[in-house]
Amino acid sequence: MDGFQEVDAEYEDRMRTFESDCNGGKGNAVACHQVGEYLSVVKNDFDKAGRIFEANCNTRNHAPSCFNLGRFLLAGKGLPQSDAQAEKVFDSACAKDHQPACLHLGFMHLYGGEGFQRDIKKAIEVLDTSCSGGLADSCNMLAKQLLRHDGKGPVPRDPPRARGLLEKGCSHNHGPSCFNLTVMLKKGDEGVPSDYQKYREYREKTESLAAQLQGIDGNKQA
C-alpha cells in the first residue's frame, strides 16, 4: 500500500509542476494539456478540464488539446454539445497530423452531423492519410465502407482498394484488419481472387494477435 501512496504522491507532485509550468494558460502548452488530462482522467472534473482544453486549443492550437476538446464537444462533457464545433477542432488537430483526430473527422464526414456540411471526399482523404500515417483503425474503417454490400455505403464498393488498406492495417498488428483480410482472402471478392496461402498466413497472424489480446472483440475465426 505504501508503494501506491508513494506513486500517488509523486504523481501529485508532477501535476503541481505542470500546473506551475502552465501558469494559468499562459505557460507551456504541453504542461497545460497534462493538467487537463489530470483533471479529466484522475479527478473527473470535466468542466475544468474542458475549459483548459478549449483555451489550449483556441489560443495555442495544441493538437492533443484540440482532439480532447472535440471529444468533449461531441459528448457534451464539460461543455455544451456541438457537432459543428467538434468537427472544427478535429479538423484543426488533423491538419497538424494528429491521427486520432483525423479518424474522428473522417467518421463525422462519413455519417454526418448537425451544423456542418458533410463531405464524403474529405472523409476518404483524411482516413486514407491517417491510415498512411500509421493509424490502423482508419485503415479498417475506410476498408469496411469500401466493402459494403447493401448499396447504402457513402462510397462505392472497391474491394481491391479495401484489400490494400487492410494490408496496411494488419502490418501494424491491428487484429480487426487482419481478421477482415482473412475473410476476404478466403472467400474472394470482386477484383480480389481467393488466395488460400495468404488466407492461412493472415489467419495465423489473426489468431496470434487474438491470443495476445485475449480475443478480438467478438470476431470469430473465418
Predicted regions and their residues:
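Hydrophobic face of amphipathic alpha-helices that form TPR/SEL1-like repeat modules
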Residues: 32-42, 52, 66-75, 104-111, ...
